């Protein structure tokens, strides 16, 4: 729950981190997390990213793109029946799958670049799990209320009101899950046609099965499992942790200015006593969708969504302190600031860590309560360094190579194969007949006519034994 600090008018939350070594046993039932709604720059950024990503996913299959009478008019289509992939003006054939492979490699390198610069920004902002959990939380807050109201509802005995709220929430979740699964199949067939067939019961069984599976996974992962998918099921946190270095941005509690904590920091400081900026209000814990306390340091569960930054900045504004007690920072920047604050490294269980107790508040605010101007803050140097430049160079080289290959590719493919049995036939007049299978792929969107001829063999002629035409393109 929450209470008002009498000295600072800052709301203090009774919030304990769920995902911490002290509170999590090896075999233990899930402890439900009730994240509080956050407000601030990063929350607004997440709203924008969520709206854009969901909009792209749900709207894209319905966008039309005129390719002429001999090709589908859906802008983005994976045409499994005809072995084609359409993306606006680009048409990819099976033998050109290296374009798709190249795009996947570029996506991987782009993800490496993002991780090396801004940490787990993919997890915090654009990962489908994060986006759909955010969407489900919007529904949960709209139906059941914010954090305190949801906690009270969970603790209350079952009643008509509680049942109605739970039923409404899960019903809306299921509608979202069905819509998510339904839209997915529209990427593999003409969306309006398949939608009509689906609603009238005439769609293929695989369409209904796919929607059913995706509905179940969306509902379970987004509504029920939530943070457990990130913590236990997804391998990416472990991979990303190995890709971070001392110049990668991560969400960091700057204990060099936050320690020692006091819930009456403003009053105690006015009395001439030395305390840090953290008032131990637990606002950062209350808003965290992963149920961690960022003040305990870097943790596997942290998806760097930065909602704790928004919550803490709001508290700092109320206290009249500088923002940034929790901020995006690099390890190199953090180490330099801890050293400037007078902290020393000590050995704890074999780890060389900074001693918070050694922080000297006079070093943090040496003059008139202002932060020491020597403290480092994130600059362009954390983004522009050899590692990121190499990633950018490789990414650009791949992109340019794919573009050149795309615009220089042949729009005609001819395959000639000799019949194996018999190799040849001697006719009654002594002539020799050879059989060949000729496959002509017209890779343009309009029909074309082709002429076959034989060069270098005097008196040779060609007979057409049979022909197949597929959609004017082969």
Name each region found by the language model:
Residues 439-444:
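Asparagine-centered strand-capping/turn motif at beta-strand->loop junctions
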Residues 400-423:
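Hydrophobic alpha-helical transmembrane segments in integral membrane proteins
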Residues 2-261, 309-310, 322, 326-396:
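Membrane-embedded alpha-helical bundles of multi-pass integral membrane proteins
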Residues 115-130, 222-237, 268-316:
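Cysteine-centered iron-sulfur cluster-binding motifs in ferredoxin-type domains/subunits
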Residues 464-474:
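Intrinsically disordered, low-complexity Pro/Gly/Ser/Thr-rich segments with frequent PxxP/GP/PP motifs
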Residues 445-461:
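Short acidic, flexible loop segments centered on an aromatic residue
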Residues 431-436:
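Short, solvent-exposed loop/turn segments enriched in Ser/Thr/Gly
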Residues 256-274:
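Membrane-embedded translocation segments of transport machinery
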């Amino acid at each position: 729950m929450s209470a008002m600090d009498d000295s600072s008018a800052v709301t203090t939350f009774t919030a304990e981190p769920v995902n911490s070594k002290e509170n999590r046993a090896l075999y233990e039932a899930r402890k439900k997390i009730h994240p509080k709604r956050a407000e601030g720059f990063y929350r607004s950024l997440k709203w924008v990213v969520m709206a854009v990503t969901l909009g792209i996913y749900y709207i894209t299959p319905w966008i039309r793109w005129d390719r002429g009478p001999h090709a589908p008019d859906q802008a983005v289509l994976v045409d499994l029946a005809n072995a084609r992939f359409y993306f606006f003006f680009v048409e990819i054939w099976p033998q050109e799958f290296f374009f798709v492979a190249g795009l996947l490699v570029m996506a991987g390198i782009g993800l490496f670049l993002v991780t090396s610069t801004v940490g787990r920004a993919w997890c915090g902002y654009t990962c489908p799990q994060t986006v759909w959990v955010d969407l489900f939380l919007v529904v949960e807050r709209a139906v059941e209320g914010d954090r305190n109201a949801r906690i009270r509802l969970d603790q209350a005995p079952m009643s008509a009101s509680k049942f109605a709220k739970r039923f409404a929430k899960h019903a809306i979740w299921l509608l979202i899950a069905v819509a998510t699964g339904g839209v997915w199949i529209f990427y593999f067939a003409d969306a309006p046609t398949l939608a009509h067939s689906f609603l009238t019961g005439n769609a293929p069984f695989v369409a209904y099965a796919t929607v059913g599976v995706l509905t179940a996974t969306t509902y379970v992962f987004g509504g029920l499992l939530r943070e457990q998918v990130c913590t236990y099921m997804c391998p990416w946190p472990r991979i990303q942790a190995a890709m971070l270095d001392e110049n990668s941005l991560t969400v960091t509690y700057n204990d060099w200015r936050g320690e020692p904590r006091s819930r009456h920091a403003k009053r105690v400081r006015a009395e001439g006593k030395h305390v840090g900026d953290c008032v131990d209000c637990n606002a950062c814990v209350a808003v965290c969708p992963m149920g961690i306390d960022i003040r305990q340091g870097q943790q596997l569960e942290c998806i760097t969504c930065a909602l704790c930054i928004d919550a803490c900045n709001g508290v700092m504004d109320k206290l009249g302190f500088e923002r940034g007690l929790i901020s995006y920072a690099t390890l190199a920047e953090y180490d330099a600031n801890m050293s400037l604050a007078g902290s020393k490294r000590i050995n704890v269980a074999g780890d060389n860590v900074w001693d918070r107790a050694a922080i000297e508040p006079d070093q943090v605010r040496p003059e008139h309560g202002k932060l020491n101007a020597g403290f480092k803050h994130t600059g362009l140097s954390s983004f522009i360094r050899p590692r990121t430049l190499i990633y950018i160079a490789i990414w650009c080289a791949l992109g340019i190579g794919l573009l050149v290959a795309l615009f220089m590719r042949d729009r005609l493919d001819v395959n000639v194969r000799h019949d194996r049995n018999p190799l040849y036939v001697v006719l009654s007049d002594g002539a020799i007949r050879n059989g060949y299978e000729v496959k002509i792929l017209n890779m343009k969107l309009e029909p074309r006519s082709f002429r076959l001829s034989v060069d270098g063999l005097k008196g040779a002629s060609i007979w057409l034994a049979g022909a197949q035409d597929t959609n004017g393109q082969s």
